[in-house]
Amino acid sequence: MKKILSAILSAATAFSMLCTPVIAAENTTPSGIEFANIGTEIEAFAEENKDSYASFAAAVFNGDEILYSKHFGYIDRENNIAANENTVYEWGSISKMFIWVSVMQLHEQGKLDLNADIQTYLPEGFLKKLKYDEPITMMNLLNHNAGWEETKSALEVADEADIISLEEALRKTEPAQTFKPGDVTAYSNWGAALAGYIVERVSGMDYAEYLHKNILEPLGMEQTSVSSDYRDNDWVRAQREKTKAYLIINYPEMGMVMDEDLGTAMSYILLYPAGSVTGTLADITKFAQAFVDDECPLFENTETLDLMLSASDFYGNSDIPKNCHGLWVTEYAVRTMGHGGNTNAGSANLVFDKESKTGVVVLTNQQSEAVFCYGIPELIFGNIENNPIYTNAAITQRNDISGNYVTSRGLFEGMVKIAPCLNYLPLEVSENPDELTSAGMPAMTRFGDNLYLLPDSNDFIYETTTSDGKIMLEYSSMAYIEDDAVANEFTAVIIFAALVIVTLVMLIVKGIKKLAKKYRAIPAGKAVLAGQLARLAVGIVLVLILVSMPEALLVPVCILAAVSGVVCLVSAVFTAKALFTEKDMKKFARVRYAFSVLCNLFTAGFVVYFQLFNFWA
């Protein structure tokens, strides 16, 4: 693929030497493909990756002209139903672009101040888990840096009867605030949905109703639904019920091959503004084209579109934009902006270059699809290695960033505080000082001061620091933050798991001895047994956390962890008392008692440190 792109780029460069730059720009994509050849290139790409898709739809446009649009594959392979112009796909987080357009519309009307405290627009006391005094503004929501951790509660339900109002869903799923507003980028579905709720509050309209009146109808998007249950468009619902979802992974060289039929995979997103929009390729193309229209029908004034497409957040102290009022910036051979989306039933991507007015939309009926959602935009916009950010970069310093990092888009409060240490990023410098590895695998390559390129990707990392001096590796919609304790926390989890296994073995041996009538009572035997059972109980709690237990079990499991921690402490006291008061105790028995005391103290500390008792966070 890279060879093909390289050849195309070389040909385009040679051609540009014979023609004026204006003519070349008007008739080629940013990667150098002539408009007339776009279909040939995409279809060749589809053939090259024919084992990687069930169905996808792609469109390429330039201004108000659609250069290419086609549906590939099947929405129901079992019944041989091919995708067509009536096929609807879930757009996932591309839905957030509708939130941000709505916000900018209300800002244009003078009804919404982007820099005001959002509590101005919310019911009194709505936000109950704020940690910092600094106000959260709409700009923080647009840039995903309000400081919230990930949500712990399920954001979608399988039964339509379980759908609740947007306000109730937000109240029920409010995450803890773990970062100071403006300090750290941490992608937040909850924060985006909160912005959608503010649109409701400010406009006085139901969010879905607002979108239909102010975005869908002006653009002629009649084949698009907004509500989580499709109640706003019966036709879309009927079409959606025909579409199956698939999980296809096709990397045989890595031993990763999977092809699974997921059925319709229909679910109902409670925070629906953040991810429920569903519609056809034609409709999403209309929406995308509006962003490169000089007379954008979304706003009264062209200045509002200009403001929306201007940078609102940057990487560190650089002049490299990260976000443009809710739209993520991606550096291909040219700078683009847009949004990707993923749901249980599909993946999507919308990308455009405001300078050339060229754009791409890709829709699929596949979970976690990346080959087409990211491969086709690269085909059209080229590779970052041809971008001035890359070609003009120079390495004048080499900071040592080796260490352990946790993602800002994580869980840091409550009983799931254990999560970051189970998924942290260890970085080491390889023999080449500009190559970094993680667990022996290539992780990133330095290509400039503070700049690192990810393997086989147009994504890059920018090295900066947090307000408290920790190294922070910024990566588009989130960051990796240096954490000196996370490796020790991971070790503690391993030690505890080992203690649980040892405890289980000891109980089995004890049971066998009792059955064989060879077991002899020991001093403080009940206290020792209670501590062992409590350790097992905490082990069960840990397993339930790791397997994503049902939300209904949250409170009882936390209570079990709390009670078990207390039992371990009490057991430690009585066992220690026996250890020091029983004068005739043999040496081996003393070792066992000391081990029991240490195990109980470790378990109690484990419960407290990882907040396994904390169900209210």
Residue positions per predicted region:
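Membrane-proximal extracellular juxtamembrane segment immediately upstream
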Residues: 459-484, 536-564, 606-609
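Hydrophobic (often cysteine-bearing) scaffold residues that line and stabilize catalytic clefts
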Residues: 38, 42, 91-95, 99, ...
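Catalytic loop of the DD-peptidase/beta-lactamase superfamily, centered on the K-T-G motif
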Residues: 26-71, 212, 262-513, 518
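Short, surface-exposed loop or secondary-structure junction motifs
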Residues: 76, 130-350
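Juxtamembrane interface at the cytosolic side of transmembrane helices
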Residues: 503-536, 582
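N-terminal leader/targeting segments and the immediately adjacent pre-domain N-terminus
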Residues: 3-83, 89, 105-112, 143, ...
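Short active-site loop at a secondary-structure junction
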Residues: 51-57, 79-140, 177-190, 272-275, ...
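Canonical alpha-helical transmembrane segments of integral membrane proteins
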Residues: 497-507, 532-543, 568, 600-607
